[in-house]
Amino acid sequence: IESAAAGAAVSVSAVDSSKILNVAVGVGGAGKVAVQGAASTALVNKQTQAVLEATDIDKDDDNAARADVTVKAQSDSKIFNTAVVAAGAGTAAVGAGVAVNRIVQQTGAEVQGGTMNLQELDIRAVAAPKIETIGVGGAVGGNVGVSGSVAVNMIANDVTAHIGSGAVIAVNGSVGVVAQSDEQISNYAGTLSGGGTAAVGVSTSVNQISGTTGAFIGDEGESTVKTSVSAKGNGSGIKTDSTVKDEQIHDTLIDKDTLAMGSQIERTAAVQKGIVVDASSTRDLKSFLVNASGGMYAGVAATVNVNLIEGATDAKISNAILNGGIAGSGSRADVSVRAGDYTNSAGFVGSLGIGVEGAGIGAGSDTNTVSRDVTAQVADSDIKAQALKVAAEGKQGISSFTVGMGAAGVGAGVAGVVTVSKMDNTTKAVLTGATADVTTLDVEANHLARTNAGNISTGGAGVGAGIGLSVGVLPDDSVPGAEVRGSTVNSSGNQSRT
């Protein structure tokens, strides 16, 4: 490809948007026995790729009118699922619902090989998968009422921006390799059971978010050909939205942000010049479950919620030469390698069991685990720059509130709640096996973790016994670290490792 004139543009773009709206309703009634069920499944599985491979742009003429090159992949997915189940009968009523929602997607923007002399290069992969679920269920029987619900919501999201395969790129302005992902799950469910003799209600929810968001220059492995990228930092720069303020991370049990459907972590925009390798990801998961059962002799309500978050955010330069073709130190642009990872997880569980003359049992469990690896790394590379910054940042917040109540007029009121909130994150900034000729060097890793958990367990009886049990387990095994090893650094300014 040869530029026809100044301001020429080359664009490779892949954009995909998917939306599923699912409504399921099941209603059953009978004089004696009614059994009603409803099941819904929504699945999204896709790949969105924008690739510029083995392509030369103004290869033979470094003084040509240079082009602006954009390689962009964007994938948005949304599932909205509503389910209503109701059953009523003179003797026994049973209502049960099952919902499974899953999004699996891979989004990539890449430049592989080729020789290019450009004005600007912007490689950008963006993905935003979202699941929203609302479920309501009830069962009322003259003698027995039983209701149950199971919800499974899963997002597996991989986002990659990459320059590799020995590409040789010289840019008068800036180079951006940007990967960005924003994931959301909002789950709301309520069940009600009633029976003249006994009522039982059971609700279970499992919500999982996983995947890797990565921005890379070069290829890992000793046998690979080095990728070369140079930039002078002229022009308008590269737009990023990769930082998140502390106030965006949960720091309370309940407020409008931890409850509201559609709320998400807000990003802060910035513009950077030079060579920008930037990977950032946010995820907001909230699950709200309420379960109530009442019977003359027994009312049993049990509610279980599990939120699982795992995966990684990586920004890496490997086996690469950066600004190697620029002679004067004053003409070398900055090099920024940044990985930012931000998580909010909220679980709210309520169970109420009422037995007028017998036993009322309310049990609830809420589990939130966050396990994310955040890495910003320069490895086995030669870099010349005004400022070289390698930064990793991880911020995670958990809000968990569990209520269990058991009440009986005559007999026993029993309540038990368990809360488990676990952090197991690594946040690393690493310079290893590198040769850096820079004015300033910063290698920093920052980590913020907040856990807010509350339990209420109440068992009471007018005549008889009241028993309440509450258990909370809140470990944090997160490890941050910044290191420089096996590297040669020539610097005329400041060096820092934090």
PLM region descriptions:
Residues I1-T498:
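Low-complexity, glycine- and small/polar-enriched segments
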